[in-house]
Regions:
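A generic structural signal for short beta-strands and their flanking turns/coil linkers
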Residues: 25-27, 68, 137, 283-285, ...
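Short, hydrophobic beta-strand segments
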Residues: 106-112, 298-301, 345-350
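Short, charged/polar surface micro-motifs in flexible loops or helix N-caps
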Residues: 12, 35-38, 292-295, 340-343
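DNA-contacting surface of Y-family translesion DNA polymerases
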Residues: 6, 181, 189-330
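A general secondary-structure junction signal
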Residues: 110, 143-147, 227, 289-291, ...
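Short Gly/Ser/Thr- and Asp/Glu-enriched loop/turn motifs at secondary-structure junctions
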Residues: 101-105, 144-147, 280-284, 328-332
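Acidic, metal-coordinating catalytic segment for phosphate/diphosphate chemistry
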Residues: 305-394
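Gly/Gly-Pro- and Ser/Thr-rich, intrinsically disordered tail segments characteristic of DNA damage-repair
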Residues: 1-222, 235, 273, 354-394
Length: 394
């Protein structure tokens, strides 16, 4: 029988922000956007903020109406990536196989390791304590015979708990839980189930698989199996990303093309950081523009494989100028990289400017990985925080 762990870092973004600024502890903290931005949604919020009815994906304006005294933050995304990697590094010391589901979620397969770690529950407590002691990050851990059970268990354990469902006890554990507890049950499916008088997971198990197959097709069959405690007992192998992209939606539609280029410069730096972390080069650069009237344009160009910020940014700017032919304010801008190949560093007897620059960018990447993305800012155009003007750096 498989033994699958699901580790979920509790209110991860908030936890990292509290490490950066301990004064935030005990306060309602909302990460995602600030009320004055106009647009944006809640990416994460503390348990103190949830007492006011806030939740992820809530529009920031609505969140502010419910919790005007909360602390609203854009988020320190470079730090989130750094702490996520640090957690994964700890887990890799123990888990034979890991599947990272998101920046704050990890599946681990500990099948066949009881003779090494003993009690799985006590081992989970040890793992939980090590992450707290070394990184100050609270987490919840679910343990079950498959991924679905482990995921539900970690949600059940929040905050900072551990839930272990022994093999053979899955149906009994699931029966009293609301049907929306099953991963993948969204609003539409929930409404359909309620219309059929199905409110608890146990209600699903009282009916046949064929009933759900007829009502909802293959998804209905999968739902029935999950309700009966069945699920994937193996983890997905790491997959190679097919693209790297970053986008920025403006709080207010932007018509200053200098500021738009400055945004593109920042986004280029972020995607190139990810590119070098993978030790890849890109051969296709794309940009995306969405105007205030929601007309969306994309442009792409194939280039010689590179991981050089300057080359990629210059390509992106040319694409921007080709795409931006309308005298309309811009709502969103994004950059997209595809067609990857492995980076192979070659020793050069005589180093040209591009080679020196590439080495500099790789050094910058290492520093940002260690101290956070904002540790080093590369200058081209800096927009002051009040958006009243521009400063050019040489």
């Amino acid at each position: 029988m498989s033994i699958i762990f699901h580790l979920d870092l509790d209110t991860f973004f908030v936890s990292v922000e509290r490490i950066i600024d301990p004064a935030l502890s005990g306060k309602p903290v909302i990460v995602g956007a600030k009320p004055e931005d106009g647009r944006g949604v809640v990416a994460a919020c503390s348990y103190e903020a949830r007492w006011y009815g806030l939740h992820s994906a809530m529009p920031i304006k609505q969140a502010y109406r419910l919790c005007p005294n909360g602390v609203y933050l854009h988020g320190t995304h470079g730090e989130y990536s750094r702490y996520s990697k640090a957690v994964k590094h700890i887990l890799e010391q123990y888990a034979p196989q890991i599947e990272q589901a998101s920046v704050d979620e990890f599946y681990m397969d500990f099948t066949g390791t009881k003779h090494i770690y003993g009690s799985m529950y006590m081992f989970a407590k040890k793992l939980q304590k090590e992450i707290i002691d070394k990184l100050s990050l609270p987490c919840s851990i679910g343990i079950g015979s498959n991924k679905t059970i482990a995921k539900i268990c970690s949600d059940y354990a929040k905050p900072e708990g551990i839930t272990y469902v022994l093999p053979g006890m899955e149906k009994e554990f699931l029966a009293p839980l609301p049907v929306e507890t099953i991963p993948g049950v969204g609003k539409v499916m929930l409404q359909n189930l309620h219309q059929k008088g199905i409110y608890k997971i146990g209600d699903i198990t009282k009916l046949s698989e064929n009933y759900f197959l007829a009502a909802f097709g293959k998804y209905g069959s999968a739902l029935w199996k999950k309700a009966n405690g069945e699920g994937k007992e193996y983890l997905n192998p790491p997959h190679k990303r097919k693209s790297i992209s970053k986008e920025k939606t403006y709080g207010k539609d932007e018509n200053n093309r200098v500021r738009i280029e400055a945004t593109l410069f920042k986004l280029t730096g972020e995607v190139c950081q990810l590119l070098r972390n993978k030790n890849w080069q890109t051969a296709t650069v794309s940009i995306k523009l969405r105007y205030s009237d929601f007309v969306t344009l994309t442009r792409a160009k194939t280039i010689k494989p590179t991981d050089d910020d300057k080359t990629i940014f210059e390509t992106a700017v040319k694409l921007l100028h080709k795409a931006d032919t309308r005298r309309v304010s811009i709502r969103l801008i994004g950059i997209h990289l595809t067609k990857f190949s492995e980076f192979c560093e070659q020793e050069e007897i005589f180093e040209d400017e591009e080679t020196i620059r590439k080495k500099m960018f790789r050094a910058v990447t290492k520093i940002r990985d260690k101290y956070g993305y904002s540790a080093i800012q590369l200058g081209r155009i800096l927009i002051d925080k009040s958006n009243k003007g521009t400063r050019y750096l040489r």
